[in-house]
């Protein structure tokens, strides 16, 4: 580790995403693994984080107490569960540590807690850290402005059998991008399930369909369907490394900032498109 490297702590270091985040850290210059965390009672406590990630021994021991390692990192990356992330967020706020949040499934109170914490510390909070997905979000804004008023809009997403929230955070972000471009409130126009006799489709609605099966990493399609034609904008992820690399790049971008709430559009400068 060079003296100038940004030290990153990974929450859920022994999970699939955590291991790939550690791998991503070792593939990028200017960043180093400072600490690794797992839930209390995990059999991985005390293990070497580098060995867990398949990169060899690195001397970073997995622990279960974030407060005990606050001096070992500059930025925390958290892709876990909402309740745990909010606990870690408060510890970061109290200790002046930046945080990158990839956790999905927050309720409105959780989102508000993140916003409030950003007054004190810098936060990147995004539903998806893939460069491609965030480009898609920008493309959807443009497509909605051209076709959205006269097209039926549907969002279809597919993930692995272990994903616990639905629709995915990315699907909701796609819906928000479209709704915002059309001046609509997603909460009012979203349709999350159809069953039985539903009547005709509300032309102002944005529909969501969810698939959970096998080991699908993540697939999202937004459809703008008119009579005689439709446009589909699709993103398919084949590896979690695309999310891991994006999150670590977000951590590097966040370094040196004092406070504020940001997303991947800020990290990638997509508002310039």
Curated annotation (Swiss-Prot):
One of its GO terms (cellular component) is cytosol. Keywords: Amino-acid biosynthesis, Cytoplasm, Diaminopimelate biosynthesis, Lysine biosynthesis, NAD, NADP, Oxidoreductase. NADP(+) binds at residue 39. PROSITE patterns: DAPB. Its main location: cytoplasm. The active site is at residues 159, 163. It holds the Pfam family DapB_N. It is found in: Cytoplasm. Its EC number is 1.17.1.8. It comes from the Bacteria. It catalyses: (S)-2,3,4,5-tetrahydrodipicolinate + NAD(+) + H2O = (2S,4S)-4-hydroxy-2,3,4,5-tetrahydrodipicolinate + NADH + H(+); (S)-2,3,4,5-tetrahydrodipicolinate + NADP(+) + H2O = (2S,4S)-4-hydroxy-2,3,4,5-tetrahydrodipicolinate + NADPH + H(+). It is an enzyme of class 1 (oxidoreductase). GO terms for biological process: diaminopimelate biosynthetic process; lysine biosynthetic process via diaminopimelate. Pathway: Amino-acid biosynthesis; L-lysine biosynthesis via DAP pathway; (S)-tetrahydrodipicolinate from L-aspartate: step 4/4. NAD(+) binds at residues 12-17, 38, 102-104, 126-129. Belongs to the DapB family. Homotetramer. HAMAP family: DapB (MF_00102). This is 4-hydroxy-tetrahydrodipicolinate reductase. The lineage of its organism: Bacteria, Pseudomonadati, Pseudomonadota, Gammaproteobacteria, Enterobacterales.
